[in-house]
Amino acid sequence: MNSSAKTASAPDSFFTATLAEADPEIAAAIKGELGRQRHEIELIASENIVSRAVLEAQGSVMTNKYAEGYPGARYYGGCEWVDVAETLAIERAKKLFGAQFANVQPNSGSQMNQAVFLALLQPGDTFMGLDLAAGGHLTHGAPVNMSGKWFKAAHYTVRRDDHLIDMDEVARRAEEVKPKLIIAGGSAYSRPWDFKRFREIADSVGAYLMVDMAHFAGLVAGGVHASPVPHAHVTTTTTHKSLRGPRGGLILCNDEALAKKFNSAIFPGLQGGPLMHVIAAKAVAFGEALRPDFKIYAKNVVENAKALAESLRGNGFDIISGGTDNHLMLVDLRPKGLRGNVSEKALVRAAITCNKNGIPFDPEKPFVTSGLRLGTPAATTRGFGVAEFKQVGGLIAEVLNAIAQADDGKAPLVEAAVKEKVKALTNRFPIYQD
């Protein structure tokens, strides 16, 4: 076959070859990950399982299109259909959260928060956020993060006795440091946020209030968690986690002048062409969250979290703050003489996926930790209810009690037995069936 014939036939393969045919190594990795998700209990609080419709949108031809700018004002031609997708995403997000303005272009939670900083702060300005060690987030001023390197972060924390945020202390701290921005929200705080009081404190010192609801946005959308949107100058959230969409970010506000600042901060400030396939998938997820059954889902997420926390407490584990009012909890492992890193690995061997996590005033290093963070969104999506989460609490206790006994011969047997129980449980609630 001559070279011209080879060139002519290449497009046939390019447009028709399956992934398994074109790249068997990646296909094998994806198949392996599908198997892992099917047969493990996912308890990482920041993870969820998206619908087949979201997967289809994210894997669509929208990935081919460059669309710098915003609907109706692009720097490229041929944007009529991606404009439809982005406009649907914007309008659905506004309706879902009761906001007047929405930017659906942030590629991630970190970038959405960076956009707020870019729009509202100058390098060196002071802002306040919950300390990472108390349940905050890297982008809320951790020293290793851009937010902590470029700006002056003054953190508030939780009380030692009950691990709750002391709003009087937040007010005192704000009066002391006079921040330009105050952030409410975090990645490992299991109790309600007093958004009204946060806004009052922000107003008292002339600060903007930003609420990062990345973790509990799905609960807000489902009506089982108070909404920060009426109180905050700006609300940010990821679109995955409890919202059950593709990985990405979202910025909401009710002020047109601020909305223009945030739009400019995203493009051209931080990003170029938006990921239109992801934005299409966001639109699908927002549409799903607007349906009545999503309210049932959100209610179940919280009920399941409470059931899991109570099951663990009944098995002798301490839960930070005594329980949970949202989708997650922190387990204090110190009464069992365990550390987070060892416990995480043992549970993974038993097909229960979670993450080690620092607890407030943790004496251990971040890669060791004294705690585990557990969440219920993913397993709730696949159909687990209160009964199943009570069972999961017992399975976790079996694994951790075995390693706490320091019997090297017993622990592997327990982990293997629990793994079989997990397999039986997950088989009752299958995902992505062929």
UniProtKB/Swiss-Prot annotation:
Metabolic or biological pathway: One-carbon metabolism; tetrahydrofolate interconversion; Amino-acid biosynthesis; glycine biosynthesis; glycine from L-serine: step 1/1
Residues bearing the modification N6-(pyridoxal phosphate)lysine: K241
Catalyzed reaction equations: (6R)-5,10-methylene-5,6,7,8-tetrahydrofolate + glycine + H2O = (6S)-5,6,7,8-tetrahydrofolate + L-serine
EC numbers for this chain: 2.1.2.1
GO molecular function ontology, one term from the record: pyridoxal phosphate binding
Cofactor(s), names only, from the UniProt record: pyridoxal 5'-phosphate
Domain of life: Bacteria
Matches recorded under InterPro entries: PyrdxlP-dep_Trfase, PyrdxlP-dep_Trfase_major, PyrdxlP-dep_Trfase_small, Ser_HO-MeTrfase, Ser_HO-MeTrfase-like, Ser_HO-MeTrfase_PLP_BS, SHMT-like_dom
Main location (coarse class): cytoplasm
Cellular compartments annotated: Cytoplasm
Amino-acid positions noted as binding (6S)-5,6,7,8-tetrahydrofolate in the UniProt annotation, renumbered to this chain: L132, G136, H137, L138
GO cellular component: cytosol
Record keyword Plastid present: no
Site entry (Plays an important role in substrate specificity), positions: H240
Keyword line: Amino-acid biosynthesis, Cytoplasm, One-carbon metabolism, Pyridoxal phosphate, Transferase
Biological process (GO), any one: glycine biosynthetic process from serine
Job description of the protein: Catalyzes the reversible interconversion of serine and glycine with tetrahydrofolate (THF) serving as the one-carbon carrier. This reaction serves as the major source of one-carbon groups required for the biosynthesis of purines, thymidylate, methionine, and other important biomolecules. Also exhibits THF-independent aldolase activity toward beta-hydroxyamino acids, producing glycine and aldehydes, via a retro-aldol mechanism.
Similarity comment: Belongs to the SHMT family.
Assembly notes: Homodimer.
Designated name of the protein: Serine hydroxymethyltransferase
Species name: Nitrobacter hamburgensis (strain DSM 10229 / NCIMB 13809 / X14)
This protein's encoding gene: glyA
